[in-house]
């Protein structure tokens, strides 16, 4: 998620995940970059152990509770479906809220798209290039980080519909070399409950990436960084946001789809969904036109232009590129199951606890207080793409920085402030330890606040002058 004005920085992130005792998050220090593919909505990195492989009772999230008729004295009335009408007054309030977060967080630029049955909102704020001052624009391409996981998950579910794999099959039946693979199912990988150690928290991986952001990684090399560590927990016992899970699922897609993962996702997901501005890159090149992305995930912690950093390190967990309009369309397609059989989509929407009240995780998506979808973060960029089913409404936003603001991903702060106005009974949550920006401080775009934690990635990493985990 990104921040607001000032020299901006953008590193794609996904879900904002608070600390958990079982999997401590690395501390982000000035001079220490923390890279981590994060997932959508704010969610705890792990939930407490439970008995059995899927001890928690799944909750089907297709029909969130309806909103009350109104959300405040003197405010526009929310319709029964949960969103307020996009009146001129509401639009003005949205403009003001977005400008406020932009200014307070130091995010360079943001694109925001809202679609409701009663109207649309599509606006850009700030700049796409801090050097030239080129304005941000909805037509620009940005990296989407962990939004990629929703595409990978959909590709796996398409294979389920084709009868090539079952969600409760052991991953060892399809992908060799996964530690404990006989006891880890495809479903547990998609639901972030494999218990494996995440490669993006391995010190050697982080040091390699931070010191050479154009390094080309293979999927097997990525997984090897995680496989050398013992499991964090038994399969199926706790939620832990983990990029390794989605690299393994990418290998599954290649094995059963018979094509490179990016090609299969393009043919089976992007093209059928009619997403003409969405792509799975094979190198660091950005399609034109694009927004420059800024990050502090560098050896010194200084903000750098990460636009053309090679995303091979994130692969099927976070490498993709899109526009805000395509994300609006995709959020609805993903949440309604337009590309899947109804029974398969129903399995996808069964969410389990994450440890964060109001937030559950299903198969490659979150339910954040009724909003279904994902968020993403990668060095230089952040995104959110979510859908509120009973309101048939979509929210998508993209930022060109991933620099944290007082420990929080800027994208979550934007989504939180926007939904306070748009859907006051369904407010996109951020981790309890985080708060909406109030005044510019040490955690602004000029650099992370000392001691701020990286959201969205689990364990570890030492040394004061080394990043602890890469955010995605």
Which residue stretches match the model-derived regions?
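Active-site donor-binding loop signature of nucleotide-sugar glycosyltransferases
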Residues: 125-127, 296, 399
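Hydrophobic/aromatic residues within well-ordered alpha-helical segments
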Residues: 90, 94, 148-151, 245, ...
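Catalytic loop of the DD-peptidase/beta-lactamase superfamily, centered on the K-T-G motif
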Residues: 46-123, 266-267, 307-472
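Secretory targeting and sorting signals
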Residues: 1-51, 58-61, 65
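Short, surface-exposed loop or secondary-structure junction motifs
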Residues: 122, 184-371, 375-379
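Alpha-solenoid HEAT/Armadillo repeat architecture
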Residues: 103, 176-179, 254
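Active-site-proximal loop and beta-strand segments within enzyme catalytic domains
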Residues: 88, 116, 125, 129-241
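Active-site SXXK
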Residues: 98-99, 112, 118-120, 141-168, ...
